[in-house]
């Protein structure tokens, strides 16, 4: 990373960025062409390893690409504020972001799918229990285990 003074490698800080993010931009490989999809997500962290959970319809381009090549990139970001400058060169943004690389898997085990959907919903709401039985026949759950992830920030204070 060029601006090492802005790099974040601490797992707790990276998890904070993910918690504050509302969208995961999942990038897939379509031959030599990248394909990026904005998605809802949830995540877990154990011993510094982050696992993402995403959902999808049970068919479509995204799932076809994962089956062909499960290598993915996931990006997250939040613009905290924008500060005008007297000139364009003096304008700046307060932001935080994270980019991770890993492997995607389309889950087939119903318990794993329920866990993934529960994790996903916990990103956006506090209610603990859900009945996913009516969704599982038409919903695919994708698990992405990140091999590496780094963050970057330009903010005045840390959260």
Spans of features found by a protein language model:
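Structural motif corresponding to alpha-helix initiation and N-cap regions
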Residues: 11, 59-60
């Amino acid at each position: 990373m060029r601006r090492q003074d802005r790099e974040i490698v601490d797992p707790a800080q990276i998890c904070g960025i993910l918690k504050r993010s509302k969208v995961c931009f999942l990038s897939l490989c379509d031959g030599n062409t990248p394909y990026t999809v904005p998605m809802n997500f949830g995540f877990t962290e154990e011993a510094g390893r982050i696992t993402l959970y995403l959902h999808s319809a049970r068919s479509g381009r995204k799932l076809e690409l994962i089956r062909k090549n499960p290598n993915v990139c996931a990006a997250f970001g939040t613009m905290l504020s924008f500060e005008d400058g007297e000139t364009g060169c003096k304008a700046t943004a307060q932001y935080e972001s994270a980019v991770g690389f890993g492997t995607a898997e389309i889950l087939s085990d119903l318990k794993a799918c329920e866990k993934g959907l529960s994790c996903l919903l916990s990103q956006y709401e506090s209610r603990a229990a859900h009945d996913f039985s009516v969704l599982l026949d038409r919903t695919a759950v994708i698990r992405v285990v990140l091999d590496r992830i780094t963050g970057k920030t330009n903010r005045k204070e840390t959260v």
